[in-house]
From Swiss-Prot:
GO biological process, one term: DNA catabolic process
GO terms for MF: exodeoxyribonuclease VII activity
Record's function text: Bidirectionally degrades single-stranded DNA into large acid-insoluble oligonucleotides, which are then degraded further into small acid-soluble oligonucleotides.
Highest taxon, organism lineage: Bacteria
Keywords: Cytoplasm, Exonuclease, Hydrolase, Nuclease
HAMAP family reported in the protein's UniProt record: Exonuc_7_S
Protein family according to the UniProt entry: Belongs to the XseB family.
Enzyme class: hydrolase
NCBIfam families per record: xseB (TIGR01280)
Name under which the protein is recorded: Exodeoxyribonuclease 7 small subunit
GO cellular component: cytosol; exodeoxyribonuclease VII complex
C-alpha cells in the first residue's frame, strides 16, 4: 500500500524535508570552513525551521488526541515531552 502525505499547503515542505534541512544546516555550521557570518545566518534559519517543526508536531499531537483519546492518555508525560510540545523555541 502506498503511503500518501496530506499537506494543508501543497507548496510547503513536509516535516521530513524540514528535518533534512536542519541536518544540512548542522553539518554546515560544524564545518570549520564556514565563516562566522554564514554560521549565524544558518543558525537563524535553523531556529525558524525548528519552530515550523514544533508547530507541525503540536498540530499532529492534537489531531491524534482527537482521533484516539485513549492512545493520547497513555503517552508518557515526561518533562522532555512537555518541553517539546509546550515551550517556546
Amino acid at each position: 500500500m502506498a503511503v500518501t502525505s496530506a499537506k494543508k499547503n501543497p507548496g510547503s515542505p513536509g516535516i521530513e524535508e524540514l528535518i533534512s534541512r536542519l541536518e544540512e544546516i548542522t553539518r554546515n555550521i560544524e564545518n570549520p570552513e564556514t565563516g562566522i557570518e554564514n554560521s549565524i545566518a544558518l543558525y537563524e534559519e535553523g531556529l525558524a525551521i525548528a519552530e515550523q517543526c514544533k508547530k507541525r508536531l503540536q498540530e499532529a499531537r492534537k489531531k491524534i488526541e482527537i482521533i484516539n483519546p485513549e492512545l493520547a492518555k497513555n503517552w508518557p508525560d515526561t518533562a522532555r515531552n512537555r518541553d517539546l510540545f509546550d515551550s517556546e523555541i
